[in-house]
């Protein structure tokens, strides 16, 4: 897998066809790596991606050539999903949340670029993932995130909740 200098920008409706391709590839990758249930029933749907765009929380990663190779949702402020946790958050200070991180698999470094960019926006990040998503769990641990407990996602299923307070380095 090649690496490329990536740019992060807000997604637009013109990105939608490519966003659907990228998320389909990410769904397939999750199934191939033992996580066939986290993004079930075509999630994230076109409607979810459109809502992210409309609310200004949808982002893409693109190569120097302008090809979209990744996408994610990033929002600042309270996420209703994180109000109740079986466990304890590291901090109740204002935070950002990352959802729906997806890679086309064409270039490396998508997740590292996304998390780095998000920490430039706010030094307190929360994220959650499915118990079967070993790839994301490993990545989050490698990036210094701490397991804080379990939350119930919007689909009614439990997720492992992580948080990291960025202090530089």
Language-model region placement:
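A short beta-loop-alpha structural element at the N-terminal edge
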Residues: 7-21
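Conserved beta-strand in the GNAT
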Residues: 60, 67-77
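A short helix-loop-beta-strand connector motif used in the catalytic cores of GNAT acetyltransferases and
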Residues: 47-60, 78-79
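Conserved GNAT-fold acetyl-CoA-binding loop/helix
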Residues: 27-47
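Conserved acetyl-CoA-binding loop-helix of GNAT-fold acetyltransferases
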Residues: 103-120, 138-142
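Conserved acyl-donor/pantetheine-binding loop and adjacent beta-alpha core of acyl/acetyltransferases
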Residues: 73-106
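Conserved GNAT acetyl-CoA-binding A-motif
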Residues: 121-132
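Conserved catalytic-core motifs of GNAT/GCN5-like acyltransferases
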Residues: 128, 146-160
